[in-house]
Amino acid sequence: LISAITNQLTVPGRSTGPVAFTIFDPVGLGQNFDGIMHLADFEERVISSRIWTQQAQFEQKLGELNEHIEKVTQMYLRNEYATLAEYNAQAGRMAEKYHFLVIADFPVNFSDVAVKRLQNIAASGPRCGVHLLIHWDQRKTAPVFPHRAPGLPRSAEIPTILRRFFPTV
């Protein structure tokens, strides 16, 4: 997957467009994404300066992505556009970036705060151009999502929006 993304975005003469990646790699400490770091050779801002590995960093970066979603919703989409793609089609050179949050070995190093922020991103992010690519290590205990109705079985802890990505959980 990472190789395909890298190949598509680094074709000579092709603009990457407004795209940014935020990458979490708590187990590999960045090694799982060595190849994608070459994108920084073409455009430094495409990768948010590094690969993040620590719990506090995850909380901070997820908070920043939540703030970005708030900004896009309130300043760009308002009641005029259903999605960031619609806004960008009209914005031309003022187009807003698409963000990809890439997570390896979820839920390692995810605090309750980080899980709640991730849930908000999963629910509201796609409309605002923030998309998730998550490798869920199913050998680890699944986190308890805060927006769960009491009395639901453990399998129902994963909200519907995330179950699309993880149907076997």
Regions inferred by a protein language model and the residue ranges of each:
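P-loop NTPase catalytic phosphate-binding loop
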Residues: L1-Y81, A91-V169
